[in-house]
């Protein structure tokens, strides 16, 4: 296999020496870019954008044409799996994703089956293959999925941004039904991510967007348990290439030790966590990704650079840090501020990697 021209991200995920801190942005292909909006208009709607490999490739590549990012991430949606299960995904204008047939009845839940990614999600695999070819080994491609619990939230509630009344009622009244959904979802996520890896993804990420809405005990039982199941089933190698995995629970700072023990290679942090404290807690086990408040990108360039330096200094010297936002980039972000961020990370981080550059890595892999 041809070597990557820039494998800094993969080395950082495995806590191997790097010359600088790599950076990519959650939702880096998105509405803050005018070219994305133009492509979306040509596609007709968001789902058509996701389901057409040509469009998905085009928008995946757009931020890399603007910014010297260290990774591409597959352009898709976290709800492709429940859509493939037949729940009828659609997007209401101004309201986000919705399902025509949310899971409310026991017979519907018992009838759930694991979709075959090669059949029901072929368009995603075609996009992964096409993006890899288009990247031409420039930077690695990250594949992703929603976590079993986050998918279940949408599947039961029928929409996002709710008070979680439906799924929490099920959790406490009929935990057996929720466990059934989560087990099916975990099998589906495992198959989906493995298919992405086989199609060319060089790292994978699990987005646990709603895990932070749970109590401590419920998080362990209904979210982390099933992400651990997924991680245990993932391909760790594709040929001779190691495939790192990232887990991100928004609001999961209280559970870093548990997440670090799940089998992932890196833990994503939201902006409420001090990354230096996080490193002291789990940095001997996993790499850390994050964790700038996305709202910082509304500030002046000097403020952005200062906030970047604060996070870099908090993490400290050595490898094992992937710079990112603490959540997805806002659609209102000025693109030039994203460039300021990326350039600041690259320039300011080098002094924290001098020992790495000299071949000395105290943290190992």
UniProtKB/Swiss-Prot annotation:
Q: What class of enzyme is it?
A: lyase
Binding site residues for substrate: 27-31, 77, 154, 209, 327
Main subcellular localization, coarse class? cytoplasm
Q: Which GO terms describe its cellular component?
A: cytosol
UniProt keywords, alphabetically: Cytoplasm, Decarboxylase, Lyase, Porphyrin biosynthesis
The Gene Ontology biological process annotation of the record reads: protoporphyrinogen IX biosynthetic process from glutamate
Subcellular location(s): the record lists: Cytoplasm
Q: How does the record describe its quaternary structure?
A: Homodimer.
What does the UniProt record say this protein does? Catalyzes the decarboxylation of four acetate groups of uroporphyrinogen-III to yield coproporphyrinogen-III.
The UniProt entry's sequence similarity note says: Belongs to the uroporphyrinogen decarboxylase family.
What the entry lists under HAMAP family is as follows: URO_D
Protein name, UniProt field? Uroporphyrinogen decarboxylase
Q: Which organism is it from?
A: Nitrosospira multiformis (strain ATCC 25196 / NCIMB 11849 / C 71)
Q: Gene encoding this polypeptide?
A: hemE
């Amino acid at each position: 296999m041809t070597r990557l021209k820039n494998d800094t991200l993969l080395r950082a995920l495995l806590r191997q020496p790097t010359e600088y801190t790599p950076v990519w942005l959650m939702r880096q292909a998105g509405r803050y870019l005018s070219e994305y909006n133009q492509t979306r208009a040509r596609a007709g709607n968001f789902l058509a954008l996701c389901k057409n490999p040509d469009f998905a490739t085009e928008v995946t590549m757009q931020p890399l044409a603007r910014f010297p990012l260290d990774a591409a991430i597959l352009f898709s949606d976290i709800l492709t799996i429940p859509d493939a299960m037949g729940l009828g995904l659609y997007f209401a204008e101004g309201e986000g994703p919705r399902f025509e047939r949310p899971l409310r009845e026991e017979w519907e839940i018992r009838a759930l089956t694991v979709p075959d990614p090669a059949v029901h999600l072929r368009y995603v695999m075609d996009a992964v293959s096409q993006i890899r070819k288009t990247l031409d080994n420039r930077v690695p491609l990250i594949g992703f999925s929603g976590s079993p619990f986050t998918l279940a939230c949408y599947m039961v509630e029928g929409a996002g941004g709710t008070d979680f009344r439906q799924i929490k009622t099920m959790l406490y009244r009929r935990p057996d039904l929720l466990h059934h959904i989560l087990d099916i979802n975990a099998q589906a996520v495992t198959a989906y991510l493995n298919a992405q890896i086989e199609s060319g993804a060089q790292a994978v990420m699990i987005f646990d967007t709603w895990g932070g809405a749970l109590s401590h005990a419920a998080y362990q039982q209904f979210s982390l348990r099933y992400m651990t199941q997924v991680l245990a089933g993932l391909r760790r190698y594709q040929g001779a290439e190691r495939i790192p995995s990232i887990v991100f629970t928004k609001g999961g700072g209280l559970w870093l030790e548990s997440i670090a023990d799940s089998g992932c290679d890196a833990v994503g942090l939201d902006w409420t966590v001090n990354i230096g404290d996080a490193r002291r807690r789990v940095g001997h086990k996993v790499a850390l990704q994050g964790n700038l408040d996305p709202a910082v990108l509304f500030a002046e360039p000097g403020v952005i650079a200062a906030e970047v330096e604060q996070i870099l200094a908090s993490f400290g010297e050595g490898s094992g840090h992937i710079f990112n936002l603490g959540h997805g980039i806002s659609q209102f972000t000025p693109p030039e501020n994203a460039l300021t961020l990326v350039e600041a990370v690259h320039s300011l981080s080098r002094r924290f990697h001098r020992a790495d550059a000299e071949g000395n890595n105290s943290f190992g892999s």
